[in-house]
Amino acid sequence: MNTTATVQRRSWPRTRLAALFATLCLLLAACSPAAAEDGPIKIGTSLPLTGQISQPGNEAKRGYEVWAELVNENGGLLGRPVQLIIKDDASDQNTVVSDYNALISSDRVDLLAGTYTSLLNLPASAIAERNKKLFVEPAGGSPQMFNRGFRYLFFTQQAMADQSGVAFANWVANLPPDQRPKTAAYPSIDDPFAEPAVAAMRGILEQAGIQTVYESTYAIDTRNFDTIAAGLKNSNPDLVVHGAGFEDGVGMVRAMRTANVQPKLLYQMGAPGMGEQYAQAIGPENTEGIFFSVSHTPDAATSGNAEFVNRYRQKYNAEPPEDAAEAFATGQVIQAAVQGAGNVKDQTAMADWLRQNSVETVLGKLSWNDNGSPNGSFPIGQWQGGKVKLVLPEPTAQSPVIPGWRPGGQ
C-alpha cells in the first residue's frame, strides 16, 4: 500500500503539476503587498439611509460620493482609485455596530468614514477605536464623544455641539434691554448632540435675565408635536430655542403654525441647514428670520468648495445642504491624513498627523484638540429672502440681522 501510494504521488501528470503551480503563483501574487497597493483604496461607512435620521443620512452619502468622484477624476488617493463601501444602519445603534464590525472584518476596508449624528457615532467610534482605525466623522459633536480618551476619533465640523449656538445666545444676551426677549422656551429632542447645545444657550440666556417659561424633551421617534405646540402657546415665550434634527424640526414648525405660535425669535438646530429641503418642507414663506448655526454655505470661498458645489448641482439639480458638505469635508480630512502619513496602513500615524496639523476644507480651516474635538467656532445663519445669510459674528457677516421670525410672508 505504501509503495503504491508513493508511486501514485510520483506519477502525477506533468500537466496537473503545472496547473497547480500556476494556481499557487496567482494566489501568491494576489495576496502580495504589490497587488494590494495597486488596487482601490476601500473606504467604508454606515449611514442612516432609512429610518428617523434618513434625510441627513442620504445627504451625507451624496457628500461622500461627490468627494470620491472628484478624487478619482484627479488621480485618486496616493495614485490609487477610491472605492466607497456604504451600508445602511437604518438609524439604529445596534445595526451601526454590526455594520462597522463587518466593514472591518468582512469587507476589510482600508479606511473608515463616520456615520451621522452623535447617537450613531458614539457606538460606531468605539468599534473603530477597539480596532485602532482612524475614525473621522461628519456629524457627532456631543461632548460625550470626546470624554472617553479615544486616540483615533476626529470630528469634522468647526466646533462641538455645546458651542453651536453660543454666538446667537451671546448676541441675544447683549441686546439692549428694551429689545431683549423677556422669556424663552426650550423644547429639545432626546439626543446627545442637541441637549448640550440647548443647555449651553439656556445658561447664557438665563444669566442675562431671560426667564425660562417652558421646557420639554421628546423621544427621537416623536411624530406629533401638537402637545408641545400647545405648551408653547400657553407659555407664550418671546424666544424659542429648539434642539432638533430635520424631521422633528420640520414637524415642530408645522405644529407651531397650526397652533398660531409665533415667538419674536426662533432658533432651531439642524433642520434649517438642510437648505431648499427645509424651505419646501415648512413652506418657503415660513422660513423668514429663523436662526441656526451654520457649518457651510454654497458661496463660501473655502478649499474645494466651488468644485463641490458645482458637481453637487450637476448631479442633483439642487443646492448642497450642509450635511452633504460636512461629509465632503470628512473626505478631505481623510485624504489629508493619508497623504500626511504617506500610506493607508499606519492608522496611528494618520491620527498623529491630524493632531499636529490643520486641514483646509469646504468648511474652512479645521484643526483639533488632543482628544479629536475641533477648536473653532460656529457662525450663525439666518433665513432672509428665501436664502441663508451669515449674520453672526458681525465681523464676518454677509448681512445684518433682520428682527423677528416672520412666518406666512409677513
Regions found by a protein language model. Name each.
Residues 18-30:
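Bacterial N-terminal signal peptides
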Residues 1-13:
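N-terminal secretory signal peptides that target proteins for export/translocation
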Residues 2-5, 21, 32-410:
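Extracytosolic ligand-binding ectodomains
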